[in-house]
């Protein structure tokens, strides 16, 4: 199973199985953006030392 499949199961567990497809895509993209944003901030903090 891919990460997206897990994400669809996770979102449908919280919201319910009747969530539209675009909601999964938008929330997945937001999750990836937030994850990489925090990841890059962590790298910048490590490089500043």
UniProtKB/Swiss-Prot annotation:
It comes from the Viruses. The keyword Transmembrane applies. It is a single-pass membrane protein. One of its GO terms (cellular component) is membrane. The chain crosses the membrane at residues 23-43. Keywords: Host membrane, Membrane, Transmembrane, Transmembrane helix. Its main location: host cell. The keyword Transmembrane applies. It is found in: Host membrane. This is Uncharacterized protein ORF13. It comes from Spiroplasma virus SpV1-C74 (SpV1).
């Amino acid at each position: 199973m891919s990460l997206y499949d897990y994400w669809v199961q996770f979102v449908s567990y919280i919201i319910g199985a009747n969530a539209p497809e675009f909601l999964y895509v938008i929330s997945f993209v937001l999750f990836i953006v937030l994850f990489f944003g925090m990841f890059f901030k962590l790298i910048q903090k490590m490089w500043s030392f």
